[in-house]
């Protein structure tokens, strides 16, 4: 998996 996906998921979790 590309780091972009991981970073996106991390950002979403951070918002919540």
From Swiss-Prot:
<dbReference type="GO" id="GO:0045087">
    <property type="term" value="P:innate immune response"/>
</dbReference>
<keyword id="KW-0027">Amidation</keyword>
<comment type="similarity">
    <text>Belongs to the frog skin active peptide (FSAP) family. Temporin subfamily.</text>
</comment>
<protein>
    <recommendedName>
        <fullName>Temporin-1Ts</fullName>
    </recommendedName>
</protein>
<keyword id="KW-0391">Immunity</keyword>
<dbReference type="GO" id="GO:0042742">
    <property type="term" value="P:defense response to bacterium"/>
</dbReference>
<keyword id="KW-0044">Antibiotic</keyword>
<keyword id="KW-0878">Amphibian defense peptide</keyword>
<comment type="function">
    <text>Antimicrobial peptide.</text>
</comment>
<feature type="modified residue" description="Phenylalanine amide">
    <location>
        <position position="16"/>
    </location>
</feature>
<keyword id="KW-0964">Secreted</keyword>
<dbReference type="GO" id="GO:0005576">
    <property type="term" value="C:extracellular region"/>
</dbReference>
<keyword id="KW-0929">Antimicrobial</keyword>
<keyword id="KW-0399">Innate immunity</keyword>
